[in-house]
Amino acid sequence: RQYSGFTSAKESNERYRYLLDQGVSGLSVAFDLPTQIGYDSDHLMAEGEVGKVGVPISSINDMERLFDDIPLDQVSTSMTINATAATLLALYIVTAERKNISIEKLRGTVQNDILKEYIARGTYIYPPEESMRLITDIFAFCSDHVPKWNTISISGYHIREAGSTAAQELAFTISNGIAYVQAAIDKGLKVDVFGKQLSFFFNAHNDFLTEIAKFRAARRLWAIIMKNRFKATNDKAMICRFHTQTGGSTLTAQQVDNNITRTTIQALSAVLGGTQSLHTNAFDEALALPTDHSAKLALRTQQIIAHESGVTQFTDPMGGSEVIEKLTSDLEDEAMSIIEKIDAMGGPISAIETGWVQNEIAKSAYAYQKSIDSEKTKIVGVNAYVDDGEPEPVLQEIDQASVRKQIEGVKAVKKNRDNHTVKTKLLQLETHAKSEKNLMPAIIDCVRAECTLGEIADVFRKQFGEFRQT
């Protein structure tokens, strides 16, 4: 499953169909920054960012173009989206409806993990309590209507990218997972039902053996917590199902071809650690969005591991190794100690609001960078075996004509739709937001009426307010 999206829905659709032809087993959608933080492509705040790091999606028209000629009942789609996850899921559902596909057949994932946004990434909009409401509304709606959908991907990836250690990535991710499970239970959901649809997202970093042990420790920890803390009895609700992406922060702008080797080693650690799905970064992603060539090479890397290495023939092939077992137990113990410390603070939301989690990550990031600067940690091509004469790589460029076309398209949607119906549906959404009703049906109604992502986000901005880090 290769993470991809850029410039426009049309061009991203072409990349998805290319990847499907090359053998990917599912799609993984990258959205641009305005989409992630609830702005339409024609908004002043979106200027300079449209299509830059992912695909811009403002309306149902964009979503239909993104999945043109892709059978949504046959392909699993992962969407890396958080603050606006409810709206993107609604757009996907309405796209399926327009293709005459039953939403009960839809398979995929929304990342929907807002806590790690406050910790590490920053694409939050609303305060934590209101964000948790949107998350649990997705849990409840999908449990009833989209049963094959994974409603959250509890993410350590970005926590590691922000500079955490392996143990901190594990602890902060599992702690956030505890908060989500408790919120779902408080909403009246049954742990043995929604627990089966939870998934995780981890980082595969440079230290090969530590990463294998980290994945094994995650599986142990989650099973123990679901069984002992939340009294789950269904084995499937105790499984730590996880996706892995190779570490983007480990890619270097210098000697970019070296990144192929880094990514291969990281991908192998994820497979040996038991990952259910995998994204291998393209070697040029330290500099730009991947080209067709680099994206294909990244895909071939994991296909060679899957089909030629032989490691996928065995469950937990590193189990029993004295080194791996000790590393696994040490990471499990260290992570549990951190989780208990967070529990004593009142849980992850309290720990986030005081800034404790962010400060712990910052300290680890500083220590790691110091070790590179002092050359204690060797990075080939950066502080060791430096080559000043390397050629410039060929990079993917953003097509500004496509960006202008995207902006014009959003303006055309707003001009040509039934704006009386749009206004009515947005007012109904605002009324729902003031109540305790599940917001998903009202969001879906807005999408059917061609309300845009930014307009829906603005309703919630007005009702919920915006979060500001202190």
Predicted regions and their residues:
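Short, glycine-/Ser/Thr-/acidic-enriched flexible segments
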Residues: 5-8, 32-34, 84, 115, ...
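Conserved, mostly hydrophobic/aromatic
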Residues: 23, 59, 100, 222, ...
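Phosphate/diphosphate-binding loops
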Residues: 58-61, 76, 81-84, 96-98, ...
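Structured ligand/cofactor/substrate-binding pocket environments in proteins
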Residues: 80-90, 127-133, 171-176, 206-224, ...
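Flexible glycine/proline-rich, aromatic-decorated loop/lid segments
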Residues: 190-194, 232-246, 254-281, 290-315, ...
